[in-house]
């Protein structure tokens, strides 16, 4: 039976389950095991700062947890990938006010209103949270996640740049993009730049090709290389010290989705293909395809294994060095596929999107078997986000952030 035959059979099963939109990547109609509501439920949310039924205990390894805590958030839905982060046992959620909570208890550690722009990503570099200033004054600020206090401040220039935005950070640099203002105060072009985290001085600044956009960029730093994708189907690698463009190529698909950089390879989903490129040369090292009429979601490398799902709800585990398949579990038609992953205590966790019956899935990493699903009972189809720290998974969904002790 060929790949197309398998796809048609699976499409019929998906359609029968009411999941036709999943074939387009929407994933809106899958269903699965549902956890009892952690408190409240419905489409409404408690008032900011209000907690819902705290006090879950860690289950046996692989067991379904009860929420340790749950609080309302002000998340606006605009941070595409990095909406929640955990650093040094502090939980940070994008929103206004920006709020930090204790990972174990959910207790509010600090809250700051009007500190950054809407849709700010929670990007950490060497223990500092870097953000664009909410004043739209060209400043980039660094915050201590534990206290919320400003520890760093810099800018690209005085008046020639519009709305610089942080795309990545490491111990040495903060990487930003910004529009270049013309005489009519328009921004037909943009720059990418690196700012020294010690001195606050601009280390390098490179104008990007005309027609590229300052929005829609997803970036990762790996050693001496800054890697990023954009809406114009570009995959680009630059030298972190000089800004020199090492290589760039068209991926064949507009992308601001997540990708991985692992042991000298850039691994990215380009629709039906999952592809790996050499970080230094751009040469393609391996690729493989999912089923016809399907596409891959965002990949993640955890404990040396590449995990990825596709839009017909199959889950894959792959050797990231070779692209060789460890396993492929196509039997999860009745649950929505995860787009974001974490691994805690030997269990693989995945966050779904656009499915009111989705949530945080727990999988056996040896074969992809579904162990359980946590759903907050809200009925919202908003995307789920997850982050992990210690023996905890943090879930963000429908303006609620929930702490799940999982080990």
Can you say where each PLM-predicted feature lies in the sequence?
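N-terminal secretory signal peptides
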Residues: 1-7, 18-26
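Short, low-complexity, disordered segments immediately C-terminal to signal peptides
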Residues: 32-59
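Beta-strand-rich domains and repeat architectures in extracellular enzymes and scaffolds
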Residues: 71-96, 120
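Repeated scaffold domains used in trafficking and secretory/extracellular systems
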Residues: 78-85, 116-124, 160-169, 211-220, ...
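Short, solvent-exposed loop/turn segments at conserved positions within beta-propeller repeat blades
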Residues: 93, 134-136, 183-189, 229-231, ...
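Short loop/turn segments that connect beta-strands within beta-propeller blades
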Residues: 103-105, 145-147, 197-199, 239-242, ...
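Blade-level signature of beta-propeller repeat domains, shared across WD40, Kelch, NHL, RCC1
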Residues: 381-407
């Amino acid at each position: 039976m060929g790949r197309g035959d398998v796809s048609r059979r699976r499409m019929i099963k998906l359609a029968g389950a009411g999941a036709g939109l999943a074939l387009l990547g929407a994933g809106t109609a899958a269903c699965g095991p549902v956890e009892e509501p952690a408190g409240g439920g419905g489409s409404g949310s408690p008032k900011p700062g209000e907690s819902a039924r705290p006090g879950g205990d860690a289950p046996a390894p692989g067991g379904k947890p009860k929420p340790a805590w749950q609080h309302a958030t002000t998340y606006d839905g605009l941070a595409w990938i990095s909406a929640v982060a955990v650093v040094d046992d502090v939980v940070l959620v994008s929103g206004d006010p920006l709020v930090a909570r204790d990972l174990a208890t959910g207790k509010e550690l600090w809250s700051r209103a009007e500190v950054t722009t809407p849709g700010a990503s929670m990007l950490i570099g060497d223990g500092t949270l870097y953000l664009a200033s909410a004043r739209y004054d060209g400043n980039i600020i660094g915050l201590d996640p534990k206290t919320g206090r400003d520890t760093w401040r810099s800018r690209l220039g005085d008046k020639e740049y519009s709305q610089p935005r942080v795309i990545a950070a490491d111990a040495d640099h903060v990487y930003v993009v910004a529009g270049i203002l013309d005489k009519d105060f328009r921004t037909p072009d943009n720059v990418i730049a690196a700012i020294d985290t010690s001195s606050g001085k601009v280390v390098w600044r490179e104008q990007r090709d005309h027609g590229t956009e300052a929005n829609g960029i997803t970036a990762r730093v790996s050693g001496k290389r800054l890697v990023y994708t954009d809406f114009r189907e570009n995959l680009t690698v630059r030298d972190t010290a000089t800004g020199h463009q090492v290589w760039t190529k068209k991926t064949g698909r507009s992308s601001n989705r997540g990708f991985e950089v692992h042991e000298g390879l850039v691994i990215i989903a380009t629709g039906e293909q999952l592809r790996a490129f050499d970080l230094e040369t751009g040469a393609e090292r391996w690729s493989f395809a999912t089923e016809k009429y399907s596409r891959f979601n965002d990949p993640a490398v955890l404990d040396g294994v590449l995990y990825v799902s596709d839009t017909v709800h199959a889950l894959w585990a792959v050797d990231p060095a070779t692209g060789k398949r460890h396993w492929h579990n196509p039997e999860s038609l009745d649950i929505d596929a995860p787009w974001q992953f974490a691994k805690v205590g030997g269990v693989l966790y995945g966050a779904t999107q656009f499915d009111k019956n989705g949530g945080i899935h727990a999988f056996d990493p040896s074969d992809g078997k579904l162990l359980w699903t946590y759903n907050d009972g809200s009925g919202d189809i908003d995307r789920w986000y997850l982050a992990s720290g210690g023996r905890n998974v943090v879930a963000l969904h429908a303006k609620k952030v929930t702490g799940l002790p999982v080990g």
